[in-house]
């Protein structure tokens, strides 16, 4: 009975969520698009001509937002061919419905075949921005969840170290709680500028937060 009440309460909140309504109206696949939008508007992350990689992209709302931003850049420069001024590569273990002008690679980005496909799209270019809305399945056991969250962030940090240009940026989802300070410290070891971000679109009750790192300390 308690579980049913919880589900009904969640459904009521979801249906009445202004960001859910806005996402439906504006064609985004998830309300998460507005988290990236708010951070981007604050930090000017996405700019015309960039190479952007979206880790854990499904269902695709972050890639949709990035695509729309780069399409605006295309409109300002009618000389360019193609639909956007830049390149977006989305990766996920799960399948994802196609998004115009977005290269989708399904698989584990640590595996050689996926990395080979990625390098084929990059054509030797370094990445300007890595974005990650990845989150593990949480168990409710604090110590286990902290380890899973840290592992996800470690994967994004390693990917960024291997592919970002020196002045590039990494934005990842994280959660406040056990292990959070260790993740921030890892960002500080890797980036010159590190800042937490809690967009308004992130639900108040959620411990979800985002960490932004800019300018690699030890670029490869």
Curated annotation (Swiss-Prot):
This is Ribosomal RNA large subunit methyltransferase E. The keyword Plastid does not apply. It is found in: Cytoplasm. Specifically methylates the uridine in position 2552 of 23S rRNA at the 2'-O position of the ribose in the fully assembled 50S ribosomal subunit. The active site is at residue 173. Its EC number is 2.1.1.166. Coiled coil: none annotated. It catalyses: uridine(2552) in 23S rRNA + S-adenosyl-L-methionine = 2'-O-methyluridine(2552) in 23S rRNA + S-adenosyl-L-homocysteine + H(+). The keyword Chaperone does not apply. GO terms for cellular component: cytoplasm.
């Amino acid at each position: 009975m308690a579980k049913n009440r919880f589900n009904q309460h969640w459904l009521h909140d979801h249906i009445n969520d202004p960001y859910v309504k806005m996402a439906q109206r504006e064609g985004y696949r998830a309300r998460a698009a507005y988290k990236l939008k708010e951070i981007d508007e604050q930090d000017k992350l996405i700019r015309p001509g960039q190479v952007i990689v979206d880790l854990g992209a499904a269902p695709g709302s972050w890639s949709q937002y990035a695509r729309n931003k780069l399409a605006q850049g295309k409109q300002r420069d009618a000389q360019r061919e193609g639909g956007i001024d830049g390149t977006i590569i989305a990766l996920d273990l799960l399948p994802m419905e196609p998004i115009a002008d977005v290269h989708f690679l399904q698989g584990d980005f640590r595996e050689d075949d996926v990395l080979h496909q990625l390098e084929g799209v990059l054509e030797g270019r370094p990445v300007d921005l890595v974005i990650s809305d990845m989150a593990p399945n949480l168990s409710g056991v604090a110590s286990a969840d902290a380890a899973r969250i840290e592992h996800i962030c470690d994967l994004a940090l390693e990917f960024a170290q291997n592919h970002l240009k020196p002045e590039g940026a990494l934005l990842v989802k994280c959660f406040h709680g056990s292990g959070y300070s260790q993740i921030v410290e890892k960002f500080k070891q890797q980036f010159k500028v590190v800042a937490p971000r809690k967009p308004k679109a992130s639900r108040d009750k959620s411990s979800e937060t985002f960490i932004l790192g800019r300018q690699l300390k030890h670029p490869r």
